[in-house]
Amino acid sequence: MSATLRLLCLMACCVALAVANRPNYGGSGYGASYGDVVKAAETAEAQASALTNAAGAAASAAKLDGADWNSLNRYGWEQGRPLLAKPYGPLDPLYAAALPPRSFVAEVDPVFKKSQYGGSYGENAYLKTDAKLGVVAI
């Protein structure tokens, strides 16, 4: 009963949002026939969002460039979910296009970080399936 009520409320909210956000094209009066007026606040928000997304993508790429790709992929295969992580070089364009807006990599587990001495920290250790996730996104 409560699941049906929740579904009805969700549908009502979606319909209300769709009706409220409908643009008013073709109205009478000067300027209304060419669409909505662009507001300065919306333009500033869009620019700030784009800059935030670009900065987040660069920070995420820098964190993931320090990861040991072989350990990450081995962990993915142990979990039954192979990771599509390949060392293709700088990841800024990849993550700028692939990540959802304002979704950044928060941390990389120390097990998967590159060692300054050549190998990875967990190179000879077998990663257990109850290990922490390699990459956490917020």
Swiss-Prot record:
It is found in: Secreted. The lineage of its organism: Eukaryota, Metazoa, Ecdysozoa, Arthropoda, Hexapoda. It comes from the Eukaryota. The gene is Cp16. Its main location: secreted. This is Chorion protein S16. It comes from Drosophila melanogaster. Residues 1-20 form the signal peptide. Chorion membrane (egg shell) protein; plays a role in protecting the egg from the environment. GO terms for molecular function: structural constituent of egg chorion.
